[in-house]
Amino acid sequence: MSRRFNPLEDPPSASSSDEEGKEIARNSSSDDEDDVSSENPSPLKTTLDAVSDSESGSDEETDSDSELEKKKDQVVTNPVDVKRAKKVKTSEKSGAKRSLEVDEAAVSMDVKRAKKVSGEEEKKKSGGGGEETKKTYFQRLWTEDDEIVVLQGLIDDKKDTGVSNTNKVYELVKKSISFDVSKNQLMEKLRALKKKYENNLGKAKDGVEPTFVKPHDRKAFELSKLVWGGIRMALASGMKSNEKSKKSSKFESVKHELDSSLPNSKNNCEDEVMDEGEVSFTKSSLVRSIVGLGMDELTAQQGLSKLASKDMKRFYEQWKAMQAREFEFFLQKHGFLFEVLSKISEAFGSNA
């Protein structure tokens, strides 16, 4: 029994004709590729061929050779380098743009500063005159030498007459002053110098003269002492003036008190005498004295009005006698104090 052919178990062997067909097809495809490659050469190959052909040229074509060499270098360059070069160019452009913006900002700042400076100069030009006028107006007229001249003039005039005469002093010093001084200006300066001297005296402690930083102040102080007296004399004169004011005020208060206490004074309301010969103290100084002790006036008047007429007369006589003795006591007291103050003033004057 013959075996049946199974194509899966025993595949048929390829025939020679089939192999030849495959070989032919392979060859034809390779030929086609060669034709395509020959028809479309790559740019790199074309450039290299052109460069190689140009190298075999004559010496007259050296310029074209160098250009081709540059093209060759450009073509052969790595694409990564090209990208980097582009980035560098971009950064250079951005840097140039940034520097241009910085330059423009600097120029604008310079322009603003120039405008500001010009504006300040214009303000100075426009307002400078006023400031100079103010400085000139408040400029010191009296120099230090002028002050010494004035004090020396006072001393010289006082030596001749014993008393300073401002009219003579003005005629004496006006030609030596550094400016055209008027008499009013001289009088104001004299008052200012005296006030300054008194202020310096106030700085003295225990009779010790104050210290000065500037030699001019020391010299002016020494000359002022010759004009208005030394420290002790000034203190004595100040004490005299204070004593006079105190004495005058004290005498005024004593006078007022005595006038109010005397029965016949103008400030005192006379004691009323009743028709029956009785005395009334309702408006007398006795009522005011009682009020001074703390009792109100109405209570004092009512209390005195309730006294018997005999007591009223006795109190009236005693009150008048005490007022007379009080007046004598005040006179003795103030005479004594005046004598003491006079001796103190003489003691200060002799030690000056």
Curated annotation (Swiss-Prot):
Residues covered by region (Disordered): 1-132, 239-269
Q: Which UniProt keywords apply?
A: Transcription, Transcription regulation
**GO BP field:** regulation of DNA-templated transcription
The Basic and acidic residues compositionally biased stretches are 89-101, 117-132, 241-259
A Pfam family (short name) is GeBP-like_DBD
UniProt KW Ribosomal protein keyword: no
Compositionally biased spans, kind Acidic residues:
56-66
The answer to keyword Membrane applying to this record is no
Q: Which family does it belong to?
A: Belongs to the GeBP family.
**PANTHER family recorded for this chain?**
BNAANNG10740D PROTEIN-RELATED (PTHR31662), DNA-BINDING STOREKEEPER PROTEIN TRANSCRIPTIONAL REGULATOR-LIKE PROTEIN (PTHR31662:SF33)
Protein name per the record: Probable transcription factor At1g11510
